Structures are given as C-alpha cells and as structure tokens.
Amino acid sequence: VKERLLRSIAARNGEVVLRRDLARFGSPAQISRALKQLVSEGKLVRIGLGVYAKAAPGPISGIPMARQPLGALAAETFDRLGIRWQLGAAQRRYNERLTTQVPWRTTFDTGKRRISRRLQIGKRIVEYENDLTRPAWRRRRSRSARPV
C-alpha cells in the first residue's frame, strides 16, 4: 500500500495531498499506517487533519519540511476543499501598496463562512478572518441589504 501511495503522490500535480484522495488504495487502517510511515520517512508533512504536503529535506538541518510556504499550501488546500477565500486584510493592503508593514501572519478571509480547520507547519498557523470576527462597521454588506 505504501508504494502505491508514494507513486500516486509523486504523480499528482500540486503540493497538497488530501487523505480522501488516497482512500481507494486500501482500508482506512492501511492508509493511516502508510501515511504515518511516509511522514516518518520525510516524504510527507502533516499540515492538518487529513491534509498532507509533499516534503523535501531542509537545506541546513536536513529535517523534512514542506516544499512550499504555508500560505501557498493553505490556498491550495482551500481550493481543493471548495472553500472560497481571499487574502486577509493585512496582506491585501500590503499587496495594494497601501502600507509598508509586512504582514507576518498567514491570514485568509473566508467571507461569511466560519472555518475551524487548523492548518499549521511547526509554529506557523493559518488564521481566519470572516464576517463573524470583523467589527460590525467593517463587515461586507450583502447585495440584498442595500436600500432600493
């Protein structure tokens, strides 16, 4: 099972591997065992529940690390899961050259959708902004709420 998983992962486009994509290769216990072995061998890095990223040895320490930064992996994960997203407010302001402060947190705006999925690599954690965490005066107004 492990060899079949490894071949499938190597042939996939993108850096993110979802557990549900590998379900056809064996029973849940076999998949769990094979994924655990691949993580311990440094072929994959676990970034969330059922979400793995392709790994490569680090240039300095040789410790396995994801081949892409957390922001890129999170964006690909959201796309694969069908979650609509955009960059967080701080990243948008920086990209639009409205500020010179470099955002150091990985933040995604999910609009009206509440997400509790935890994605992390090491100590870096993806944080979420949505209409529930945004102050009332900064919330997006829906089109139906506009006066006629």
Language-model regions, residue ranges each:
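Nucleic-acid-binding surface
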Residues: 8, 56-148
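Short beta-edge/loop segments at beta->alpha junctions of small alpha/beta modules
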Residues: 1-72
